Amino acid sequence: IAIFEKDGSLRKNNASSVVRGAGAEASVMSVKADEHGLYAASYSRLGTFEGVMRLNWVTGDIDYMADCHGDSYDVLPAGDVVYAASHSHDCSNIGGFPDVSYHYHNAVAYTNAATGTVEDNHGAGYKNYAGQNATTNLNFYPDFTPGKISGAIQATWTVEGNDKYVVYGGEFLAVNGTAQQGLVRFARRDIAPNKQGPMDKGGAFKVSGSSPRAGVVSLSFKANWDRDDKTLTYNVYRDAMNGQPVTSQTATAGFWERPDLSATDVVEPGSTHRYRVQVTDQWGASTVSDWVTVKAAEGQGLSKYGARVLADGAAHYWSFDETSGDKAEDFVAQRNLTIRGKAYKRGAGSVLGSGASLGLTSDSANKSHAATRVASQAPTAFSMEAWVRTTSTSGGEIMGYGSSAANQSWSRDR
């Protein structure tokens, strides 16, 4: 790539010292420009650079790169977004989707700015651009059915647009499951119909229910996904959908990183209820699961305090109400604790006046503690409530995040 001065002389350009897009099986396929810089779309069969990058007009440096494996054929800068015609199959180097059996994405979008740095290369046979400025792979994943006229099994070849629409051209037969041949137009968000909702629809969105203890119903479901919205809202309804949901939560995830979600409801022990989960994007497009019927276990129900904790929307709740064993159940997210050490006691009365308690010791020879089996990312801020009775006057940590579940954590948050 070369940038020329007005008099025809060559302007200093540092891009070629980083990216080499030339040779028998590598090329810069398209170059576009705007006031921010010069944009290039590249392919390579020699393991150099595939993806999109932006060069700075003044310095000749690479402002950012979208190090996404898979040929890129054309690029369109459109304000704060850059669109590419490609068959991208691995954007994990910039925090995007990973390579899954070479599933091609023929239209992708990126933030038109540097948002971080490229990670160490995740794919064999490609050059490592770790540390270079990177952009972000946006949640824009239309699905194309490729044609066969060229034999390249490539759906999109070009992308153009204006301040209202983005247009892809190529040899495709359908888009998002609807017949659409060779040319397709996508509207910008503010004028788009915004009818593409969560993709696992109706009965395909699976919800399971159980009752782990008296009067408590636990629902489990995997996060849904959406072609153009990464954040979805999950409302859980009991018996009917004409009132307020039992619980509501949001989850932000790409199609490749869908977490397991859960919800908890407190009802009369022995009662039977139907539950349904509605998933909605920020534009109102939604789907609902089938109803799932759950009978709450019989017996002594959750205490008034525990019911209030759940009603307040706690992310986790361990009551330590079990009278035996080495487990402490999480009533909200099923992140159960394992009690470690020998010097612990169960079944004594609780300081809350009802239920049982867990007795631990910090004695150096007989330490005991409780921890989750699976690690999770510590949040930057959170609140907690714990009821404790102690005879110690030396103080110490009651609850927090640490680097070890089995032993003393050398890295912890408090």
Feature map (PLM): residue ranges:
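Extracellular/periplasmic catalytic domains that process cell-envelope and extracellular macromolecules
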Residues: 32, 76, 308-313, 350-352, ...
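Extracellular glycan-recognition modules
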Residues: 324, 328, 365-414
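Structural recognition of the beta-strand scaffold that forms the well-ordered cores
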Residues: 83, 316-319, 400
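Extracytoplasmic surface signature
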Residues: 1-301, 312
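Residues within well-ordered beta-strands of beta-sheet-rich folds
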Residues: 220, 274-278, 317-321, 381-389
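Parallel beta-helix/beta-solenoid repeats that form elongated, surface-exposed shafts/blades used
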Residues: 163, 301-307, 410-413
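Extracytoplasmic low-complexity segments
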Residues: 296-364
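Extracellular acidic, Ser/Thr/Pro-rich low-complexity tracts
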Residues: 223-229, 281, 324-331, 390-392
